[in-house]
Amino acid sequence: MEFPDHSRHLLQCLSEQRHQGFLCDCTVLVGDAQFRAHRAVLASCSMYFHLFYKDQLDKRDIVHLNSDIVTAPAFALLLEFMYEGKLQFKDLPIEDVLAAASYLHMYDIVKVCKKKLKEKATTEADSTKKEEDASSCSDKVESLSDGSSHMAGDLPSDEDEGEDEKLNILPSKRDLAAEPGNMWMRLPSDSAGIPQAGGEAEPHATAAGKTVASPCSSTESLSQRSVTSVRDSADVDCVLDLSVKSSLSGVENLNSSYFSSQDVLRSNLVQVKVEKEASCDESDVGTNDYDMEHSTVKESVSTNNRVQYEPAHLAPLREDSVLRELEREDKASDDEMMTPESERVQVEGGMESSLLPYVSNILSPAGQIFMCPLCNKVFPSPHILQIHLSTHFREQDGLRSKPAADVNVPTCSLCGKTFSCMYTLKRHERTHSGEKPYTCTQCGKSFQYSHNLSRHAVVHTREKPHACKWCERRFTQSGDLYRHIRKFHCELVNSLSVKSEALSLPAVRDWTLEDSSQELWK
């Protein structure tokens, strides 16, 4: 005959006895909190208490739990579960219950806590995703409404379409020869603010392919392009007018047109310089006007802080033009003879003084240059500078790694292995000779190294310095302790290795094995 309610009645009686303190034969201390309980119940529900009472039952009346891992409310909850068979989290954090259950080897509670944490993480992730979707939808609606209103306000009228095309696109034969397939452009907002030169407006309005012969007119058009390109560089991010799109079928985007305008500007600078030398025999008035215009163009190119960067294929063109200018100025100014070495030094010094401010403006968006402190090379970004510096450090490390020929390095005569000092060499030579200089005074056993003798001496003193932190069993050697942990506490180690990253919860503690400063029992 079976009594189904017997187990429930037994637990109820034990719970009443615990509350009354009747026949309680142990006290569990968690920090400052004390819990009276029965050893039989604790050992039946927790593998920790089972191993704790297994060896010396009579000397274990008080049990100290690590308060850094097990909190008093969490242990009270688990104690109620042991006596009543019910687990009620109430307002207690699930993480604390998980830590206490893992410490006490209550694996059923550990599974329940992990399941609840996963459900909590899933619900939080779903709610966060819904909020992000709602916010992204609202942002898209706002951006669409703003974009439609902006485009409606920027649309030009059909009557002014032809005039805008004439004002915004200024092609010439010289530009097409410098960069075929690309044309220089200007935004509609700048057409009204910059007046055209007198010698330039009429030829472009009547015939687009007509070339200008005089240096003054060419420099005027070049200066006008430089001013317009400066204003375009400040407004790179703005949208082109729709009226210009019909004439820009060969241009892919604004950046390519911006680069082509810079190419045309560089080529015009070189050609204008040649024209200046060809027309040096003309009247002084034309020469003075040209010099004034050309100095303006050079100033706008070299000291313009709005130019952000330059394509890599323009660097050789600019360097060649600067070198030609420097050579011509040197030949015109220096009448006395110079050696080849002094000529090369002067040209290199001129290049550095002229290129350094220009590179400082175009290589870095913030107007910065990154120079190597060892070789004075200039780089466009700090990342490339770090890669370059690593080559210097590798060279220095290579020089350090090669010892000098006259330095005596401790080397083993049998196997050729090198060592940092003579002490390590002598220790290594014992592996070849079999020498064992350290002898135990009690049993006469010899050892090669002193630490092996110290480990052996514990056998004679019967000292057990290695203790298990879960069941407090003590061992003479550390290897015996490791084997004991693998045999009896392997599941605990695996359960405590679960980290907060696996659960995707930043609030979950990292339950790794840590050294406890308090003893578990006295």
From Swiss-Prot:
Matches recorded under InterPro entries: BTB/POZ_dom, SKP1/BTB/POZ_sf, Znf_C2H2_sf, Znf_C2H2_type
Signal peptide residue numbers: none
Free-text function comment from the UniProt entry: Transcriptional repressor that plays a role in various developmental processes such as myogenesis and brain development. Specifically binds the consensus DNA sequence 5'-[AC]ACATCTG[GT][AC]-3' which contains the E box core, and acts by recruiting chromatin remodeling multiprotein complexes. Plays a key role in myogenesis by directly repressing the expression of ID2 and ID3, 2 inhibitors of skeletal myogenesis. Also involved in controlling cell division of progenitor cells and regulating the survival of postmitotic cortical neurons.
Gene this protein is translated from: ZBTB18
Subcellular location per the Swiss-Prot or TrEMBL entry: Nucleus
GO cellular component, one term: nucleus
Glycoprotein keyword on record: no
GO biological process: negative regulation of DNA-templated transcription; negative regulation of transcription by RNA polymerase II; regulation of transcription by RNA polymerase II; skeletal muscle tissue development
Modified residues (Phosphoserine): 157, 516-517
Compositional bias ranges of the Basic and acidic residues kind: 121-143
Keywords, alphabetical: Developmental protein, DNA-binding, Isopeptide bond, Metal-binding, Nucleus, Phosphoprotein, Repeat, Repressor, Transcription, Transcription regulation, Ubl conjugation, Zinc, Zinc-finger
Pfam family, one: BTB
Glycyl lysine isopeptide (Lys-Gly) (interchain with G-Cter in SUMO2) crosslink site(s): 273
CDD domains assigned to the protein according to its UniProt record, in alphabetical order: BTB_POZ_ZBTB18_RP58
Name used for this protein in its record: Zinc finger and BTB domain-containing protein 18
Ranges for region Disordered: 121-165
Domain BTB span(s) in chain numbering: 24-91
Subunit structure, as described in the record: Interacts with DNMT3A.
Region (Interaction with DNMT3A): 310-427
Family: Belongs to the krueppel C2H2-type zinc-finger protein family. ZBTB18 subfamily.
Zinc finger motifs (C2H2-type), residue ranges: 370-392, 410-432, 438-460, 466-489
Lineage: Eukaryota, Metazoa, Chordata, Craniata, Vertebrata
Keyword Zinc applies: yes
Transmembrane intervals: none
GO molecular function term, any single one: zinc ion binding
